[in-house]
Amino acid sequence: INTSMELAQWSVSYEANWLQCSKQKTAAEGTFLRITVNENTGETKRTANIKVTSTTATYTITVNQYAKGEVIVEGDIKVTPTGGKASEHQEGQDIENTYDGKFSTDGAAPFHTPWGQSAKFPVTLEYYFKGDTEIDYLIYYTRSGNGNFGKVKVYTTTNPDRSDYTLQGEYDFKEQNAPSKVSFSEGIKATGIKFEVLSGLGDFVSCDEMEFYKTNTDKTLDKQLLTVFTDITCTEIKNNVTNEQIQALPDYFVRIAEAVRDNTYDKWEKEFRIRSYEPYSNIAEWADKLMTKKYSDLDNPTGISVKAGDDIIVLVGDTYGQNISMQCIWETGTEYKQTASSGDVYMLNPGVNKLTMKGEGQLFVMYNTELTSNTAKPIKIHIPLGSGTVNGFFDLKEHKTDEKYAELLKKSTHKYFCIRGEKIMFYFHRNKLLEYVPNNILSAIHLWDNIVGWQQELMGIDDVRPSQVNNHLFAISPEGSYMWASDYQIGFVYTYLGNILLEDNVMAAEDNAWGPAHEIGHVHQAAINWASSTESSNNLFSNFI
């Protein structure tokens, strides 16, 4: 690593005993830091941090060394800004927080406009670059809460003095709590990239991280896999592929190729590891249009659970230019536990993706778009053997019967089990489902699908479903409180599930239907919610039920 500083102006320190660092200077190469590493003979990746301290700054160089046989994915090349400025910011939450590599879920502070007052739109965020590397695309990461970008203009410049910005495009990130990706028509050696944010959730502007990338067009692993498999999802073997070609793959993919070739891929594992994921509508956009609370965007469960630190391989087929990501959902709360409405998000690109899980939970595919677009097509994704644990889920449209539900529930091992109906999803404690409804779910899911449908009909919004909007309500089973409704979720305390999942119990006591319908009514009441009527106007829906 070269530097323009003299040897005496900087120092280096590290603790790992499997690498060596030396400060050197030669006539040909000038002053530089040489890093050499020993062979990794272990079975897992190892990481070391090298601290370089100078009179002007301190830098940390992270060295990752993979084990023999470990899957090495050549990702795209991250381009880090050299600086930046924003038109306004809350103290301690300036633009530097958006390119420090730290997310709010890790305890870091995001960028945020001043609290307690509306942002002075348009809010500008400007990023500086050396201009020596092409930038092909960028990813805007949101935080959970106010400030998610709505409408935004993106400008670039290649001038050394960062003048004469050129408009690259106008976008609508729809104020959603999900990453947004902007791809340029061609790579730009930008010296500056400027965002002009015209609107934001709650009249604020925030940004967790802003990442910039050069596309890596020389992905050796992708090319190697396509000598054996028919496409990058690795679900079918090409005709006339030899065993020698298969054995030449990394060990991880040898096992996959052999399972596909020999038809030994476990049927249950395969059902959830290889799936086509449907597009769903944008919840923020339709909540605004239909005057409702936000439905859930967790419409696409994978049925796969993970633990913190797991390395997960995700093979993504043609995305048709759509942006998709993976979200890991676990729990929140101190007084009592309940399912979180959002979690760590990992962007997905076509091809081989390798994700390191920050925390435990179940994985959901985030695929939200305009349903009327001709590119809103199902996307094939393969989460191969060895990546996470299959827990499964029950889908009414796909699995159809109580017998299949009972089979899937008994095979599941995670704390929570997901049931997807037409209009509502249950994400409930597995042990409570085994206690109350171990063998039958159809009566419950049909009942609550109907109740949601009746409320939508009463609102007069059933005509746009599912052609334009198709998100589900998402019911969870908190370990405290009673019943409630909010954006993204409705909650029914886990000790009460028997009263809403067993049709006889629902019909036996008025409150067993009225109470949940009252909470679902909170989701739909905005158009009739007069002042001081929050706990009564929604009863129009529960009385209708």
Regions inferred by a protein language model and the residue ranges of each:
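Surface-exposed binding patches on compact interaction domains or structured appendages
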Residues: 3-34
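A short beta-strand micro-motif common to beta-rich folds, especially ectodomain repeats
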Residues: 44-55
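Disordered, acidic Ser/Thr/Pro-rich linker "stalks" and the adjacent N-terminal cap
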Residues: 69-130, 143-148, 216-224
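Extracellular beta-rich ligand/substrate-recognition surface
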Residues: 104-123, 170-176, 286-295
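Extended extracellular/luminal ectodomain segments enriched in beta-structured repeat modules
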Residues: 120-122, 130-137, 189-190, 306-312
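Trp- and acidic/polar-enriched beta-sheet ligand-binding modules for extracellular glycan
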Residues: 121-122, 144-217
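Beta-strand-enriched, solvent-exposed domains that form extended recognition/catalytic surfaces
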Residues: 228-392
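Catalytic cores of extracellular degradative/oxidative enzymes
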Residues: 405-411, 415-545
